[in-house]
C-alpha cells in the first residue's frame, strides 16, 4: 500500500450524542486541518488528513472529537482516532476509542482506492 498522500475519512455517528471536532495533532507538532463538513453533525463528521506516510510529515498523530449529549450539557468525553504509519512496507495502523464511555464502541476500517488514496470509516455506536 502506498502510504503517501491523503487520508480521507468519515465518522458515522449512531448514538444520541453530538460529535464536535476538536483538533488533530501530528508527531511533527503540526495541526492537521479537518476538511469537509467540520461543523457538528448529528450524522457524523467528514475529514481529510493530508501528507500521511513514511515520506510525509504526518507519520503519527491523532484526531480528537468532543462528544456532547443532545441537551447541550458539558462534554461527556472524547473520541480519539489515531494513526501510525512508520514502516513503509506496512499499512497505516489505525485505532479509535472513546474515553470514559463504556456504553459506546468505535469500529474503524481503512480502504484503498484504485489510485492509492485511502478512506477511513469509523462507526460510533451504542452497545446494548
Give the label of every model feature segment:
Residues 1-128:
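Intrinsically disordered, low-complexity segments enriched in small/polar residues
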Amino acid at each position: 500500500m502506498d502510504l503517501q498522500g491523503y487520508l480521507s475519512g468519515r465518522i458515522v455517528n449512531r448514538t444520541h450524542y453530538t460529535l464536535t471536532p476538536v483538533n488533530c495533532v501530528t508527531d511533527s507538532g503540526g495541526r492537521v486541518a479537518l476538511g469537509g463538513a467540520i461543523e457538528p453533525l448529528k450524522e457524523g463528521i467528514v475529514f481529510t488528513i493530508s501528507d500521511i506516510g513514511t515520506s510525509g510529515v504526518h507519520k503519527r498523530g491523532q484526531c480528537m472529537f468532543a462528544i456532547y449529549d443532545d441537551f447541550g450539557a458539558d462534554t461527556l468525553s472524547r473520541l480519539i482516532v489515531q494513526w501510525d504509519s512508520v514502516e513503509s512496507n506496512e499499512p497505516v495502523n489505525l485505532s479509535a476509542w472513546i474515553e470514559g464511555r463504556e456504553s459506546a464502541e468505535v469500529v474503524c476500517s481503512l480502504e484503498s482506492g484504485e489510485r492509492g488514496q485511502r478512506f477511513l470509516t469509523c462507526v460510533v455506536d451504542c452497545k446494548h
